[in-house]
Amino acid sequence: MSEECTHDCSNCGAACSSRDAAPQHDAPNPNSSVKKVIGVVSGKGGVGKSMTSALLACAMARRGYHCGILDADITGPSIPKLFGIHGRAMADDKGCWPIQSRMGIDVMSINLLVENEEDPVVWRGPVIAGAVKQFWTDVVWKDVDFLFVDMPPGTGDVPLTVFQSLPVDGIVVVASPQELVSMIVAKAVNMAEMMKEIGRAHV
């Protein structure tokens, strides 16, 4: 796969692994251009997954890459708070636009769409999964080199939706050194490998 790959095979004649799997993924917003999608996962909560997502984006931004973070943790979003973002995301006829942090990192989170960031999101799994999918299909990710997807812990509806809907190029697994955590992390890694085998991810 070319380093310039945007996962849009409609205007590309190159033969690569991305072309074989691309039809199974949801198309991004027509105005988006995302080169690499990196999932950040963990077996359990409280291990610093969201902080890792933020630090990875900051590190790559300092290297000159344009980065974005898709906050897929719908019921426990923390990315806007980490970047000190309190505004509301805006939308127009092209789609919904992420809010840019002071470092130039594009951020989209459910907390940027609700009136009060402390209001709970009491949605069932399919609705949450649908919202995450819309963060990919409806949000304009403009000229993003690396899009980090901060997922909720575990192997539930949201991680499954991300692997099925987005062209994930790789994952970062965040863990703490406990035996129980290691076992749960193994589940997350095995899930990623399973999705790779059936052509849903490039990890």
Task: Give short role names for the model-derived ranges.
Residues V34, G45, D71, I79, ...:
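Residue-level signature of catalytic and energy-coupling elements of molecular machines
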